[in-house]
């Protein structure tokens, strides 16, 4: 380092310097396809979390958690001598980021300990909750993830205060870097109201999809009311909408709010100006802790978190009907907390309903409610539900237990992923149940014979590939929903989706069902094949045929064991959110969106857990297999369709072709002979992306080389197999 220099020479990634995205803001972000790699994971490639969790003494962990609840620490004293309320909030906020629109968020990855969630305003002081848990995490190490421990701590908090939970399942594996594919909103200001630039609201308070929170940095709603307006009825609209986007109906919503607010208190002892920076902005000596407060002691009775101050009911560390009793018993006056936040205090409170101070037993306070809380009384939808619960404690307790379990397990996927001795035996509709295998599975000879029958049925390569893909592509790695298992493509709503080409689908399924019935009726040893398996097998057979057409021999991997779900096991409304509005792999776009077709492709690839090379080879294969929606010619850059060749890449990168937008459709392009002007090909933005984007073009060049034919086939088969088995957690 030169003695006159201001700093040593470091790369621009260490500090400063313009990134590619800074220079070209519209550049496609492919980095989201390469998150959570082994390079960021300290556990190593061979680490098997499920195996480690099965070694865990869950009862011992729970015993330690119960002890922690009342082991108040001087550096962060427990309210009422019990940390239960804090840990319930931690678990709730870990799970509450889930949104059903894209399945992202939720408790399943332990992301609350990473940016941005660790520094969201709504997560203020939850860093203290995780630090309180650290001795237990340290004790049990790799056998319990942070993701599981945070949820378990919430359960133990409830149980230690007298509530009977519905159950607990482990199996959440931690991530080790922020989940950068999650869109939290476009605002550039924490808690920006809807009148600010880049608002998530449009029209008559229409919330942008897939967002499920009303402001940047909140989990659900603003407790003070919409944009801070203390209107309980208006707040009811926000409460219903945000909880619905997290897959909760109004009854579950009331149960969660009333049940969760039975415990603990809010903190707003003084002005927010006393509160220091969040963890990600805090100085290095803070060691990852944020929101250091200069108000009084900065803790205990002087704590500032949400700005709202007080408890909802007497006895905040005990499960009872106090919340609903107080909600309906009293009239409420609007006040401002010591921090300046809108809240409501009960009027003319009976002595029995006064709340003892959380840190000074000589003081008592009136119960408080937030504006959002009062929506449970005054909203025309939520109010009657809350009133009914107030008169039926057993129904309320059962509803809260089930809703809490759903809240904390919604993003875990099928029950086959659940681990531990406290997994509930009851099958729930929101778990997308699939029957257990109850018959002998087909073997290698059966598979070969069935493939021959399928290929002789009159169904084309493209029809078989399209149907198998349509069945499997609903899978979302975010919340582990969808996929080919269950054969729900034959059920409502999937059988009616435009992208699944209902008329063709009906024809294909009829022929496959005929083959299935004939095979099953011919067996005498209990052996059967499901339609779910046969749909996937049809795709495998078609790809093998296409490879043979190209001169390559080989077998596409196939593992039987899928089962057929029933319509009764399928919540049609819940599955509606899985409908692809865009699927670049089938060159399908339902309508023009504000998001580009290529961005939608990357998002779909991410949900399918594909890398950029996997996405690239998959697109190239699907195009030459003629597997476009509506048999569209766009992107079918080959003169020999249904033949598994690298023609897509060869012809896309041919400098003898010049591309220009088609006059009739600005989303379609024409590729014409550079010399004669004759039309050679047509393609979409998705197709041309692989010649336009420098990173994807580099990958496309690999597959366009003369010696790449066999590699292309092998790589395509590998990624096809990955997608077909994405939901086969039983194979793990």
From Swiss-Prot:
- One annotated Gene Ontology cellular component of this protein: cytosol
Region annotation (Disordered) maps to: 1-20
UniProt remark on cofactor binding? Binds 1 heme b (iron(II)-protoporphyrin IX) group per dimer.
Name the cofactor(s) required for activity, per the record.
heme b
Enzyme class, broadest EC rank: oxidoreductase
Name one molecular function that GO assigns to this entry. Answer: heme binding
- Single GO biological process annotation from the record: hydrogen peroxide catabolic process
Q: Is-annotated flag, keyword tRNA processing?
A: no
Q: Which reaction does it catalyse?
A: H2O2 + AH2 = A + 2 H2O; 2 H2O2 = O2 + 2 H2O
Task: Note the site residues: Transition state stabilizer.
Answer: 89
Q: Where is the active site?
A: 93 (proton acceptor)
EC number(s) given by UniProt: 1.11.1.21
List UniProt keywords, sorted A-Z: Heme, Hydrogen peroxide, Iron, Metal-binding, Oxidoreductase, Peroxidase
Establish whether keyword Cytoplasm is in the entry. no
Give the sites of the cross-link named Tryptophyl-tyrosyl-methioninium (Tyr-Met) (with W-92): 220-246
Q: Matching InterPro entries, A to Z? A: Catalase_peroxidase (IPR000763), Haem_peroxidase (IPR002016), Haem_peroxidase_sf (IPR010255), Peroxidases_AS (IPR019794), Peroxidases_heam-ligand_BS (IPR019793)
Assembly and oligomerization: Homodimer or homotetramer.
Q: Which family does it belong to?
A: Belongs to the peroxidase family. Peroxidase/catalase subfamily.
Listed name of the protein: Catalase-peroxidase
Q: Which organism is it from?
A: Desulfosudis oleivorans (strain DSM 6200 / JCM 39069 / Hxd3) (Desulfococcus oleovorans)
């Amino acid at each position: 380092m030169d003695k006159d220099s201001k700093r040593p020479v470091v790369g621009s990634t260490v500090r400063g310097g313009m990134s590619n995205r800074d220079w070209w803001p519209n550049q496609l972000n492919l980095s989201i396809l390469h998150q959570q790699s082994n390079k960021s994971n300290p556990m190593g490639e061979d680490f098997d979390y499920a195996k480690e969790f099965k070694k865990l003494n869950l009862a011992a962990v729970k015993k330690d958690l119960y002890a922690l609840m009342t082991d108040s620490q001087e550096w962060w004293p427990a309210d009422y001598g019990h940390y239960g309320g804090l840990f319930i909030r931690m678990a709730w906020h870990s799970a509450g980021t889930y949104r059903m629109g894209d399945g992202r968020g939720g408790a399943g990855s332990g992301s609350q300990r990473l940016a941005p969630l660790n520094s969201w305003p709504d997560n203020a002081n939850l860093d203290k909750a995780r630090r309180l848990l650290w001795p237990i995490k340290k004790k049990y190490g790799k056998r319990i993830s942070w993701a599981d421990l945070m949820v378990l701590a919430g359960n133990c908090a409830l149980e230690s205060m007298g509530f009977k939970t519905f159950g607990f399942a482990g199996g959440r594996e931690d991530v080790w870097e922020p989940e950068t594919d999650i869109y939290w909103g476009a605002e550039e200001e924490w808690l920006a109201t809807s009148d600010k630039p880049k608002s998530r609201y449009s029209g008559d308070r229409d919330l942008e999809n897939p967002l499920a929170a009303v402001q940047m940095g909140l989990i659900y709603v603003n407790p003070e009311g919409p944009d801070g307006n203390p209107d309980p009825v208006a707040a009811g609209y926000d409460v219903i909408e945000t909880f619905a986007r997290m897959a909760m109906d109004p009854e579950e919503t009331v149960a969660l709010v009333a049940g969760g607010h039975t415990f603990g208190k809010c903190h707003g002892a003084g002005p927010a100006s006393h509160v220091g920076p969040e963890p990600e902005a805090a100085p290095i000596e803070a060691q990852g802790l944020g929101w250091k407060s200069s108000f009084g002691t900065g803790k205990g009775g002087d704590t500032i978190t949400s700005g709202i101050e007080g408890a909802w009911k007497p006895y905040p560390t005990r499960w009872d009907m106090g919340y609903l009793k107080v909600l309906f018993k009293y009239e409420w006056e609007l006040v401002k907390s010591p921090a300046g936040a809108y809240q409501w205090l009960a009027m003319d409170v009976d002595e029995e309903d006064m709340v003892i101070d959380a840190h000074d037993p000589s003081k008592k306070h009136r119960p408080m409610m937030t504006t959002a809380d009062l929506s449970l009384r005054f909203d025309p939808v939520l109010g009657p539900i809350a009133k009914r619960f107030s008169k039926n404690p057993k129904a309320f307790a059962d509803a809260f237990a089930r809703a809490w379990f759903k809240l904390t397990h919604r993003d875990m996927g099928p029950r086959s992923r659940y681990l531990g001795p406290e997994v509930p035996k009851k099958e729930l509709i929101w778990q997308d149940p699939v029957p257990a295998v109850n018959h002998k599975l087909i073997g290698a000879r059966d598979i070969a014979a069935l493939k021959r029958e399928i290929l002789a049925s009159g169904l084309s390569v493209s029809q078989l590939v399209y149907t198998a893909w349509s069945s499997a592509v609903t899978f979302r790695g975010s919340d582990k929903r969808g996929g080919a298992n269950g054969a729900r493509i034959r059920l409502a709503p999937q059988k009616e989706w435009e992208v699944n080409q209902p008329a063709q689908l009906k024809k294909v399924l009829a022929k496959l069902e005929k083959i299935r019935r004939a095979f099953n009726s011919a067996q005498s040893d209990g052996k059967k094949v499901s339609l779910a398996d046969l749909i996937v097998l049809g795709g495998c057979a078609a790809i093998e045929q296409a490879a043979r057409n190209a001169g390559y021999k080989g077998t596409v991997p196939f593992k039987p064991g899928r089962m057929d779900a029933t319509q009764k096991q399928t919540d049609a409304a819940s599955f509606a959110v899985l409908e692809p509005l865009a699927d670049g792999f089938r060159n399908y776009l339902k309508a023009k969106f504000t998001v580009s077709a290529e961005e939608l492709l990357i998002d779909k690839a991410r949900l399918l857990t594909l890398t950029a090379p996997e996405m690239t080879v998959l697109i190239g294969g699907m195009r030459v297999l003629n597997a476009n929606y509506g048999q569209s010619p766009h992107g079918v850059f080959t003169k020999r369709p249904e033949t598994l060749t690298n023609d897509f890449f060869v012809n896309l990168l041919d400098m003898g072709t010049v591309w220009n937008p088609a006059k009739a459709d600005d989303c379609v392009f024409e590729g014409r002979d550079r010399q004669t002007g004759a039309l050679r090909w047509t393609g979409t933005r998705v197709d041309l992306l692989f010649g336009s984007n420098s990173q994807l073009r580099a990958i496309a060049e690999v597959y366009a080389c003369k010696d790449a034919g066999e590699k292309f086939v092998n790589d395509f088969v590998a990624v096809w197999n990955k997608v077909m088995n994405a939901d086969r957690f039983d194979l793990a």
